[in-house]
Regions:
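S-adenosyl-L-methionine
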Residues: 1-39, 44-51, 75, 136, ...
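Conserved S-adenosyl-L-methionine
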Residues: 31-87
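Conserved Class I SAM-dependent methyltransferase catalytic core
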Residues: 263-313
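Class I S-adenosyl-L-methionine
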Residues: 295-342
Length: 342
């Protein structure tokens, strides 16, 4: 796997394994220079598009994704030094105990919560691109502390807090040792710093990250290729499963606002999205097959675009978080559609 992808946070809906399939039907940057990513998510598609030389305009309503866009897509030269990591541990008069009060020991251990309360105060005080890089490091740190990135697993964190090693799942104990979960936070932060720095590069383009509602974003940008990866109907909504992470990142308890794509009829929200996308001459759409089958999706896209290529791939996002039955029937639907620029 391309080593720059390690800079990104692990994301349940990530497209790292599908990058070659997504890009194989697309015109090169010399023919279609501007790549628009309307649902940035974990950032793998935008980072790959940047590496290929497209000018990337990416967007996501979630702050966790916007952090990725600012730190790795928009940023083309600023990296983190060892001193930046050291400053995360310095006492800060604006430090609160928000994370320790609300998220230990259910989400992270008390020791890690105290570090994170200090680290977030220092990261938010940083200036310019360094702020986004440090916030990305802390997002990756939190996800690294979670069993397979799963925020629903409280028992294991309670066992770590109490030192009940013999009672713990041995698979997680091995994983925890591999990821140095019990080590000093600075050692983990140094590993994450190096990962993030490897993802910072220039492609000679002026790339931009936005944090907007998708329909507002689509009205305001122009481009040649539009990548659409909306939340899949019938699956766990990110805003619910990542509520704890979003709250920690915001510094306050947030209540999830369900996406229009996660509730209601899937075809209605998709049709509205496609209608708002008609100005773009090339679409790439990725979607899950939980509620919408490939044939239905093709018919819907054909209402707006004359040339449609459709493929279906067996795809598992996180093996440890899905049943054998789910892995067997799960498919990633991929559509490339072409029309005329309007």
């Amino acid at each position: 796997m391309w080593n720059r992808l390690a800079a990104l946070p692990p994301y349940f809906g990530g497209k790292r394994k599908l990058l070659r399939q997504i890009f194989k039907h697309l015109p090169p940057p010399v023919e279609a220079p501007v790549f628009v990513d309307a649902f940035l998510g974990g950032g793998s598609v935008s980072l790959f598009a940047k590496a290929r030389g497209y000018r990337v305009l990416c967007n996501d309503v979630a702050l966790r994704s916007f952090v990725v866009g600012k730190a790795l897509i928009e940023n083309d030269h600023v990296t983190l030094g060892q001193g930046d990591v050291t400053r995360l541990f310095q006492e800060n008069g604006n430090r609160s105990d928000f994370i320790e009060r609300h998220y230990s020991p259910d989400v992270v251990t008390t020791r890690h919560a105290r570090f994170l309360d200090t680290a977030f105060a220092n990261a938010r005080a940083a200036v310019g691109t360094k702020k986004w890089l440090l916030l990305l490091l802390l997002v990756k740190f939190i996800l690294r502390m979670r069993p397979m990135g799963n925020f629903g697993a409280k028992t294991i964190i309670h066992q770590v807090e109490a030192g009940e090693w013999e009672a713990m799942n041995p698979h997680y104990v091995r994983d925890m040792l591999t990821r140095n979960v019990c080590g000093h936070p600075k050692r983990v932060a140094e590993v994450l710093r190096e990962q993030i720095n490897a993802g910072v590069f220039s492609n000679g383009q002026e790339n931009r990250a936005y944090q907007q509602d998708v329909f507002e974003f689509l009205r305001g940008v122009e481009g040649d290729i539009l990548y659409l990866d909306p939340p899949y109907a019938g699956t766990s909504a990110y805003e619910t499963s990542l509520k704890a992470l979003d709250s920690i990142l915001e510094g306050l308890r947030v209540e999830p606002k369900p996406s229009v794509f996660s509730r209601g009829k899937a075809t209605e929200s998709l049709e509205r999205l496609f209608e708002a996308s008609q100005r773009f001459p090339v679409w790439v759409l990725s979607y899950g097959n939980r509620e919408v089958q490939l044939e239905t999706l093709v018919r819907l896209v054909e209402k707006f675009m004359p040339v449609v290529v459709a493929e279906s791939y067996r795809y598992t996002h996180l093996t440890g978080l899905s049943s054998a039955e789910h892995r067997e029937r799960n498919r990633e639907l991929l559509i490339v559609a072409k029309g005329k620029k309007r």
